[in-house]
């Protein structure tokens, strides 16, 4: 969490009002991906891997919500997609962000909370939410912050 707060403060300091809207759109990407992923869970009632006795021993707590899709994957891929598009001039950044989101998502498989398909579904939802948030940010930027160097 401190990483995200420090990053947000750096964006605010560097880009001022445009940075504030960037943060608003990033938060919107997370909210949309999280809610969309939660919505899908109500239709696909897949139990978590930790619901079986063999896996339950690997995690301290097995959530009572359904498994497909992974909210962790959706949220982190939403941020990765959004920031990759916003800072597309930084050529190495998308690789770092996708690897970071991938590690977060795969950790959910490692601890027995999700199946690989759960994180793939979450990643898809997240990338779509990230693109949608970027489209909104682009409209706001073009209308109000055309001179900004983002």
Q: Where do the protein language model's features map onto the residues?
A:
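Transmembrane alpha-helix/helix-exit interface in multi-pass inner-membrane proteins
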Residues: 30-48
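Membrane-interface interhelical connector segments
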Residues: 45-59
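Membrane-embedded catalytic cores of phosphoryl/pyrophosphoryl-handling enzymes
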Residues: 15, 60-150
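Interfacial segments of alpha-helical transmembrane regions
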Residues: 6-36
């Amino acid at each position: 969490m401190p990483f995200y707060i420090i990053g947000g403060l750096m964006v605010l300091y560097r880009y001022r009002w445009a940075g504030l809207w960037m943060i608003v759109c990033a938060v919107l990407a997370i909210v949309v991906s999280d809610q969309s992923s939660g919505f899908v869970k109500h239709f696909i009632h897949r139990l978590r891997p930790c619901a079986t006795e063999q896996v339950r021993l690997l995690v301290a707590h097995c959530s009572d919500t359904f498994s497909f899709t992974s909210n962790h994957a959706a949220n982190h891929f939403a941020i990765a997609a959004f920031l990759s598009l916003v800072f597309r001039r930084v050529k190495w950044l998308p690789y770092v962000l996708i690897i970071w989101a991938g590690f977060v998502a795969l950790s959910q498989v490692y601890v027995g909370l999700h199946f690989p398909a759960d994180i793939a579904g979450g990643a898809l939802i997240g990338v779509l939410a990230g693109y949608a948030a970027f489209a909104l940010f682009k409209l706001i930027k073009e209308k109000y912050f055309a001179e900004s160097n983002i």
